[in-house]
């Protein structure tokens, strides 16, 4: 598995040994970033990226390679965080990224929550959010609602949700669906955060 675009194009990413983590395939990542850049005014350049259910970090790392300013990776699985640390170090992106151990569906206490998230309270809201949860469990909608309630999202931020095509994803309140595209058994949805919670 490799970075498919930007200044780190072609660089290898560490991959999971188990089936518990399902990284976004290179072909799908390339299609996704083409849609963002050509269909949504390139929201990647200069973005503050939040990668929820980060796994290997492929989506957030791809965004950093393509000009994002900062990425915060959130995953509660030990294997995922180990892969994230390995990939961030191998790509030399430690200065523009952070990794948090957190349940992505429980961000509603807020990024400003009295030190509860450690250094997260000092982070500005995010302009581009990737969600690639385990398919078919309704976790993406829960995570979106939680991130919105917790103040993690900038007004007008773009959300990219990767879900099983058969899951019939419905965006929670506060999000406008901009686009829905099918790729084999996967569906990509692009949503816009409509403002404050």
Which positions does each model-derived feature cover?
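Class I S-adenosyl-L-methionine-dependent methyltransferase catalytic core
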Residues: 1-197
């Amino acid at each position: 598995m490799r970075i498919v675009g930007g200044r780190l194009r072609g660089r290898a990413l560490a991959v999971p040994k188990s089936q518990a983590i399902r990284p976004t395939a290179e072909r799908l990542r390339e299609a996704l970033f083409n849609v963002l850049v050509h269909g949504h005014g390139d929201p990647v350049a200069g973005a503050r990226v939040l990668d929820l259910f980060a796994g290997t970090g492929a989506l957030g790392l791809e965004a950093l390679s393509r000009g994002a300013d900062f990425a915060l990776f959130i995953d509660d699985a030990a294997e995922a965080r180990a892969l994230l640390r390995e990939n961030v170090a191998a790509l030399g992106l430690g200065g523009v990224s952070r990794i948090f151990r957190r349940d992505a569906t429980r961000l509603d206490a807020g990024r400003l929550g009295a030190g509860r998230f450690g250094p997260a309270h000092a982070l500005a809201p995010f302009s581009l959010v990737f969600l690639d949860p385990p398919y078919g469990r309704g976790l993406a909608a829960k995570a979106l609602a939680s991130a919105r309630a917790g103040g993690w999202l900038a007004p007008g931020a773009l959300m990219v949700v990767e879900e099983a095509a058969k899951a019939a994803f419905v965006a929670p309140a506060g999000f406008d669906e901009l686009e829905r595209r099918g790729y084999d058994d996967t569906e990509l949805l692009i949503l816009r955060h409509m403002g404050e919670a």
